């Protein structure tokens, strides 16, 4: 039992260690990497949270939407464990709706692993933002700019309706 408690304490302390090492790396390389990357979050009304390469596609969708005057943003997770819950909740504090993108099925009937973590972080921070979890890219299926534009359109509709509707969704499934 004591060993498991020590592991848990180590995980609590790991975020500070990661931040310290990231500073050292920035000093050597000139590149800064935080716990997550924020893209266009400074004035975002809606946001996507995700891990991985589809963030590039999402940035393209955000750029297209911002050209039309819509304020979307992105949080790309870099450190998943220990999960930076407080930092993520802080980054999302001003959005009205957020889509959490999971590339893995959770088999829980209420969301994928990232969705569960982000929603728990938002709950603990008493966030008033609507949150929906999308499962996408299963089996290696590509996500397209149009897919991410649809996600942002869904978020815009959620804000307009003042209702998240179904919070556990699939993106790009053939029906």
What are these regions (language model features)?
Residues 1-37:
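Conformationally flexible catalytic loops at phosphate/diphosphate-handling active centers
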Residues 9-24, 52-60, 83-86, 109-117, ...:
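Conserved active-site and cofactor/substrate-binding residues in soluble primary-metabolism enzymes
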Residues 88-109:
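A structural-propensity feature for long, helix-poor, extended segments
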């Amino acid at each position: 039992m004591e060993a498991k408690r020590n592991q848990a304490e180590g995980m609590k302390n790991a975020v500070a260690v990661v931040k310290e090492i990231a500073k050292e790396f920035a000093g050597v390389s000139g590149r800064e990497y935080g716990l997550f990357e924020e893209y266009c979050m400074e004035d975002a009304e809606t946001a996507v949270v995700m891990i991985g390469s589809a963030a590039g596609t999402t940035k393209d969708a955000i750029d297209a939407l911002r050209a039309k005057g819509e304020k979307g943003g992105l949080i790309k997770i870099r450190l998943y464990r220990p999960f930076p819950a407080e930092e993520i909740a802080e980054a999302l504090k001003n959005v009205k709706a957020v889509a959490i993108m999971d590339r893995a099925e959770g088999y829980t009937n209420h969301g994928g692993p990232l969705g569960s973590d982000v929603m728990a972080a938002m709950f603990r921070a008493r966030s008033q933002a609507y949150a929906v979890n999308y499962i996408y890219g299963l089996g290696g299926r590509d996500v397209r700019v149009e897919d991410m534009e649809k996600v942002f359109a869904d978020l815009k509709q959620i804000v307009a309706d003042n209702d998240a509707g179904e919070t556990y969704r699939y993106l790009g499934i053939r029906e």
